[in-house]
Each structure stands twice: as C-alpha cells, then as structure tokens.
Amino acid sequence: MSAQPVDIQIFGRTLRVNCPPEQQEALNQAAEDLNQRLQNLKVRTRVTNTEQLVFIAALNVCHELAQERLKTRDYAANMEQRIRLLQQTIEQALVEQGRITERPGNQFE
C-alpha cells in the first residue's frame, strides 16, 4: 500500500508525515513515546530549548538501541553455543548407541 499523509502532535507541534495505513497505529505510539520522553527530559534537565531536548532524546534512543543490539548479539551467541553443545551431545549419544548395537550378543534371533 502507498503511504498516506498523517498529522501527528509532538511537543506542541503538528508534523505531517507519510505513513502506510497499516503502520499508522505504530506511528502514533512512537509519537506518544517521543512526546513523553521530551516532557520527562524537560522536567529532569530543566532544558527549555526544544532543539536541544530533541537532540538529547535522539541520543538516548540511539544509546538504548545500541544496548538492545548488544543484548541481541550476546543472546544469539549464547544460543549458538547451546546449540553446538546439544549437537555434540546428540552425536555422542548416537556414537554410543552405535557401539552398543554393534557388540556381539546384542542381536535378536
């Protein structure tokens, strides 16, 4: 689907952005999140310059994204290690099973 113009309110300003209809709800939630972040920053830092608040918020979001990427990378590495260990355990069990079935006297008559 093609993007449609959508008006969103951020920090008292109306912005018109193009957005596919199926993503409008996510856009509105993102706008609400940004609005809340800016309000919290304004109170916490006592900065009144909107541009400065936007830059600080952007830096915070980038930092959070970097932290999440790191956690995802660590999680993936951990899962890969667990999968390798599981594969080794299965292979070892199959080798042991092969040894047991190859022993003389283990055949049914």
Curated annotation (Swiss-Prot):
Localization (cell): Cytoplasm
InterPro entries, per the entry: Cell_div_ZapA-like (IPR007838), Cell_div_ZapA-like_sf (IPR036192), Cell_div_ZapA_eubact (IPR023771), Cell_div_ZapA_N (IPR042233)
Keyword Coiled coil part of the UniProt annotation: yes
Keyword Chloroplast: no
Regions annotated as coiled coil: 21-97
Keywords: Cell cycle, Cell division, Coiled coil, Cytoplasm, Septation
Database matches in Pfam families: ZapA (PF05164)
GO term, biological process aspect, one: FtsZ-dependent cytokinesis
Gene3D superfamilies: 1.20.5.50, Cell division protein ZapA protomer, N-terminal domain
Main localization (coarse): cytoplasm
Any one annotated GO CC term: plasma membrane
Family statement drawn from the similarity comment of this UniProt entry: Belongs to the ZapA family. Type 1 subfamily.
Function: Activator of cell division through the inhibition of FtsZ GTPase activity, therefore promoting FtsZ assembly into bundles of protofilaments necessary for the formation of the division Z ring. It is recruited early at mid-cell but it is not essential for cell division.
Subunit structure: Homodimer. Interacts with FtsZ.
PANTHER family for this protein: CELL DIVISION PROTEIN ZAPA
NCBIfam families associated with the record: PRK10972.1
Protein name (Swiss-Prot/TrEMBL): Cell division protein ZapA
High-level lineage: Bacteria, Pseudomonadati, Pseudomonadota, Gammaproteobacteria, Enterobacterales
